[in-house]
A protein has these predicted regions:
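Short, conserved micro-motifs composed of acidic
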Residues: 99, 103-106, 110-113, 120-223
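TPR-repeat structural position
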Residues: 43, 77-78, 124
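Structural motif corresponding to the intra-repeat A-B loop/turn of tetratricopeptide repeats
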Residues: 40, 74-75, 121
Length: 223
């Protein structure tokens, strides 16, 4: 009886060990996919897989960074990213190993992404603070990145002033070509005032394919 019990326990231990290895192997595979999608800027594909990784290991700062970055790039409501990026900046490391699925700390750029998320949430002081935090991770010879962060800080400072000193505007429909019955938002006007760029959830966009939330999503450009 004791021998039989030992055999059963050995089998259970072996099965659990195999399950653990299988989960780690699956994690490694999906981590590589998300890492590649984020590198390519394909946040829509990265988002659902990032969620799976986070469900598997919700204490992993690197995974939280991936999920937050995916939300920041893919979801129209970028404020969702804040929760995960705030978690990730709690364990940022200068020794971060890029592309390593065993890495549990987050990269320095997490501060930059969190700053962007704060900016979209109108939390401009928090955005500015985190842009400055990110500057300590920039190579002294990387003038391009340094200047980009400087420009983002100026954007947040200007946005803060605009919110504190609002300007009266008149909202006017631009007609059915521009305004649809669906959600149209995030308009941007080019510097010369001749081009309008905005996001729309109108039917038939995204090549006829639905976004992960069951709606269409496309950026429209009108001149």
């Amino acid at each position: 009886m004791r021998a039989g019990l030992s055999i059963v326990l050995s089998i259970l231990f072996f099965c659990n060990l195999n399950a653990q290895v299988a989960n780690e192997a699956d994690f490694k595979k999906k981590f590589a996919l998300v890492d590649g999608y984020l590198f390519d800027g394909d946040y829509i594909k990265a988002l659902p897989i990032s969620k799976e990784l986070y469900n598997y290991d919700s204490t992993n700062a690197n995974v939280a960074y991936m999920l937050g970055t995916s939300y920041l790039g893919a979801d129209p409501d970028r404020k969702i990213a804040i929760r995960y990026l705030e978690q990730a900046v709690g364990n940022v490391s200068l020794m971060y190993k890029e592309g390593d699925y065993k890495e549990k700390t987050a990269p320095g750029i997490t501060y930059y992404n969190l700053a962007k998320a704060y900016h979209f949430a109108y939390r401009f002081d928090d955005a500015i603070s985190n842009f400055y935090n990110y500057r300590s991770f920039i190579d002294l010879e990387d003038a391009k990145t340094y200047n980009e962060v400087k420009r983002q800080i100026e954007y947040s400072e200007n946005a803060k002033l605009l919110i504190e000193q609002p300007v009266n505007i008149k909202v006017q429909s631009l007609g059915p070509v521009i305004n649809s019955q669906y959600e149209d938002y995030s308009p941007v006007i080019s510097a010369d005032g001749n081009t309008l760029i905005f996001t729309s959830r109108r039917e038939g966009s995204t090549g006829g394919k639905l976004f992960y939330d069951g709606k269409y999503l496309k950026i429209f450009i009108f001149q």
